[in-house]
C-alpha cells in the first residue's frame, strides 16, 4: 500500500549503512533506491485531485522533546520536509501527543480513520506518520431503493446489522480461490471487491496472492451479469 511505502521511505531516508541499503533493496527491487524514490515521488504528485475523485496524503514526523532524550539529525528533518512535504512536530509523547496524532490522522483521512494510537510506549522517541484518504463519487450513484439493512458476517462468524448497497453489474472477476466484481467511480477509477472461497481464511488467501495475479485478474474481467 502507498501509505506503508511512504512511511518506509521516510524511515529509509533516516537510516544509514547496511540498514539503508537493505531497505532500498526491499522497497525498490530491480532499481536503485534513488531511482525508486524518484518514481515514488512522481506517483504521489500524479494522484487524482478532481471534483469526482480525490486522493489526499499527509506525512508528519513527531519527535519526543521531553528530557532531550533524542535529537534527530537536521539533514533528515530537512529532507522529509522538502521531499515529502512532511510536517515536523516536537511533542512530550504523553497522552496529549497521542490525542494530537489521532486528531491529525482523523482530519487528514476525512474522518475515515479516527484512531491509530491508544497509548505511546515509554521508549518511543519518534513517530513517522502517513495518512492517506481516497474519496470518490460513484459513476452511477445508488438510489434509496438499492440500500437495505442486512447482516454482515465477519471472518470469525460473528454478525452485525449494517446498511448494504445492492446492484446488478456485468464486471465479474474470477481467480483461483476467489471471485468478485468491479464498480466504477468517477474520473476513471474502480472499486474492486474480492471474496475468498468458503473454507479459506483471509490471511491464507492473502499469503498466496501476488501483484501479478491481482493485475491479471483485473485486466480479464468477465462480461457476466451478477447481483452484488
Predicted regions and their residues:
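Short Gly/aromatic-enriched secondary-structure transition segments
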Residues: 23-27, 142-149, 203-212
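Short, well-ordered alpha-helical packing segments
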Residues: 8-9, 24, 44, 129
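Non-catalytic, conformational "gating/processing" segments within enzyme and secreted inhibitor domains
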Residues: 36-199, 215-228
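Flexible propeptides and autoinhibitory/regulatory segments associated with cysteine proteases
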Residues: 1-23, 107, 111
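Generic N-terminal helix/loop capping motif
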Residues: 10, 14-17, 26-30, 46, ...
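Active-site helix/loop module of the DD-peptidase/beta-lactamase fold
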Residues: 28-34, 38
